[in-house]
Design a protein with these regions (language model features):
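Active-site-proximal segment of zinc-dependent metalloprotease catalytic domains
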Residues: 1-201, 205, 209-214
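Non-catalytic C-terminal accessory/binding modules of secreted extracellular proteins
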Residues: 2-37, 45, 61-64, 125-169, ...
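Short beta-strands within extracellular/lumenal beta-sheet-rich domains
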Residues: 269-271, 295-314, 371-378
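Extended extracellular/luminal ectodomain segments enriched in beta-structured repeat modules
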Residues: 300-304, 311-322, 329-331, 383-386, ...
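Short beta-strand segments and strand-loop junctions that repeat across beta-rich extracellular domains
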Residues: 333-347, 388, 418-423
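Short beta-strand-plus-loop segments that form exposed binding edges in beta-rich domains
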Residues: 389-397
Length: 604
């Protein structure tokens, strides 16, 4: 299923086949599979959920990433690393640890480390003690790791080879879950609403959403043959033959199928929009002091502002940091670090704690809320040659971050009116309590059809009972996506109508269940998203009620006439607020099998 061309005994194309198809032959990969490796512990030791985290938390007994260490210990105990040739596992420097611009060199970490655990995954109804399939980073810190690239993780015995990034899936997992998690390993986010408060419009249109659970129409299972990635994911990875335009350009061209490079036709079109600005007010100023250093906010951050001293401190020196912070308590942390020799030490302060309820405090971390500006005191150790302000967040939720107004010790008084002495490392200077950012956004149009692996678009499913699904075809045609860099996730529950990458539904009005009482899920609200020349229909069954046929009349024109042209307040989580750019895309013609559409882009 993983690397064998044709999938071997799996019967469907392998993961290697799938990614070669996704990339239109631009990406090829191979790997090694170890023998089954016993590890110490039960599935509950690694997969049980805390009450606070709920389903998929896998954190009741500590971070689930401890399974990485247990697996590495098991590989060492096997005597031959489970049959893995470790000379072949480190070829790239994926984060450019030595900052030389060369990613094609070893960095001491296994390039891609995946684990398959026995039994079912929690994500496939394996029970609350099972591990939820995911991609993450094990034991992140900057004190452990190979020489020259200390990014945490765990070492494989004493080989000098470490594991940081990893994925884990269940032994009965379908290829879709493996493909989805590998997508994360390549840098792609989840497209579904990870708050689980709503369903956005991505549905089965992307591997990084429900598309990971796709299968062929005739397949009695789900998740065995995922849908393709969306146009933005392929653009991000450089896997598209792309037509690029700017808003206001007028052009007529042909779009071939997004699922393959047809050479003579484009796979997708990108329409770049004028940038826009937004003013943020993260923290108020501290009295008359107008300037502060700000960490920023977001998921999976590790920002480090470094101030190198002109010499080293001769003795332990009291330090006072003026700060205001709002940090997700127990999960995200800020640190005051001191560099002594070549080692960074986490300084204990009046606001820090050594407690680590979720095993994410690297030591002396600051978390929670300060309720305004306060003085944080501590001691920089003798021999300090630099200090560092660090803000680290995990992959979900989060607060506003932390603001630093002043750092005082000895004769040094670093007010933030001048930050030129800092290597900011992602932090920014804020004046007057606000700053303005500029964001890029654009539309992507792709021709989607149930062909090649994407024939799983005719295996889109919905449950009619707890263990029975019916399958239907998503509509064919031109799917228009709105990519907005000013929105950091697709959690429309928190920002209705807005996401980082969402498909615009050509039929944005609500679809109601046969009894007239409920909305169909977001997956089915978006079934008719494409702009098309054709009338298309599906028949959906509501358990205990009956079936109803829903018809989508042809809609040939996408016209971004206003930000709410395709947004419905009574479908706020599933419809999309667009840019209001006046851009227009018209479907003019198509060949008989709809493998090629002629489209025109202009501005009305």
């Amino acid at each position: 299923m993983l690397f064998t061309p044709g999938g071997g005994s799996y019967g469907n194309p392998s993961l290697t086949d799938f990614y070669q198809e996704l990339s239109s032959g631009r990406f090829a990969w191979d790997g090694q599979v170890s023998n089954w490796t016993p590890i110490n512990g039960t599935k509950a030791d690694f997969g049980a959920n805390s009450e606070a985290a709920g389903d998929g938390g896998d954190d009741a007994n500590g971070p689930v990433s401890r399974v990485v260490k247990a697996t590495l210990d098991g590989l060492v105990a096997s005597g031959n690393y489970g049959g893995i040739d470790i000379a072949k596992v480190d070829k790239t420097d994926r984060y450019d640890c030595d900052h030389d611009g060369n990613f094609n060199e070893p960095d001491g970490y296994i390039d891609h480390f995946g684990m398959i655990h026995a039994g079912e995954g929690e994500d496939a109804n394996g029970g609350p003690d099972a591990i939820w399939s995911h991609r993450s980073y094990a034991n992140p810190n900057d004190e452990q790791g190979p020489t020259g690239c200390k990014m945490g993780g765990y070492q494989l015995g004493d080989t000098g080879i470490w594991v940081g990034d990893y994925t884990i899936e269940a032994e009965n997992g379908g290829m879709g879950v493996f493909a989805h998690e590998f997508g994360h390993d390549l840098g792609l986010p989840d497209y579904y609403d990870t708050s689980y408060g709503s369903e956005n419009s991505t549905g089965f249109w992307s591997l990084m959403s429900s598309g990971s659970w796709g299968s062929y129409a005739e397949d009695p299972f789900i998740g065995t043959s995922p849908m393709h990635m969306d146009a933005y994911a392929k653009q991000y990875l450089g896997w598209l033959d792309l037509k690029t335009l700017n808003a206001g350009d007028k052009a007529t061209f042909k779009l071939g199928q997004a699922e393959r490079d047809m050479r003579n036709n484009y796979q997708a079109a990108a329409i770049n929009l004028p940038t826009y600005q937004r003013t943020e007010k993260p923290f108020p100023t501290d009295g008359s002091d107008q300037d502060y250093l700000y960490s920023g906010k977001g998921d999976s951050l590790d920002r480090k502002a470094v101030r190198t001293l002109s010499g080293q401190l001769a003795s332990d020196t009291p330090v006072t940091v003026r700060a205001n912070y709002d940090i997700e308590e127990g999960w995200d942390y800020a640190y005051l670090d001191a560099k002594v020799g070549e080692t960074w030490k986490h300084v204990a302060t009046s606001a820090s704690s050594a407690e680590s309820p979720n095993r994410q405090n690297f030591g002396n971390g600051i978390t929670g809320t300060s309720d305004g500006w306060q003085d944080i005191t501590g001691t920089l150790p003798a021999g300090t040659t630099a200090y560092r302000l660090r803000y680290w967040t995990d992959g979900a939720a989060g607060g506003e971050g932390i603001a630093i107004g002043d750092v005082k010790f000895g004769s040094t008084d670093d007010t933030m009116s001048d930050t030129s002495a800092f290597d900011l490392g992602g932090w920014r200077k804020v004046t007057g309590g606000q700053f303005t950012d500029t964001f890029h956004h654009w539309y992507l149009a792709e021709n989607r059809a149930p062909v090649l692996q994407d024939r799983s678009l005719c295996g889109a499913y919905q449950f009619t009972t707890a263990s029975w699904v019916e399958k239907h075809c998503y509509a064919k045609g031109i799917v228009v996506w709105y990519r907005n860099e000013g929105v950091r996730d697709n959690n429309t529950y928190f920002h209705p109508g807005q996401g980082e990458i969402l498909p615009v539904d050509s039929h944005p009005d609500r679809i109601i269940t046969p009894d007239g009482k409920f909305l169909w899920s977001g997956r089915w609200q978006a079934w008719d998203a494409p702009f098309s020349l054709d009338k298309q229909s599906i028949t959906l069954t509501q358990a205990g009620v009956g079936s109803k046929t829903y018809t989508a009349e042809p809609v040939t024109t996408f016209w971004d006439s206003s930000p709410t042209a395709y947004y419905r307040s009574n479908l706020q989580f599933n419809s999309v607020k667009t840019a209001g750019s006046d851009v227009r895309l018209r479907v003019l013609d198509a060949n008989a099998d709809r493998s090629t559409y002629t489209v025109q882009v202009d501005k009305k």
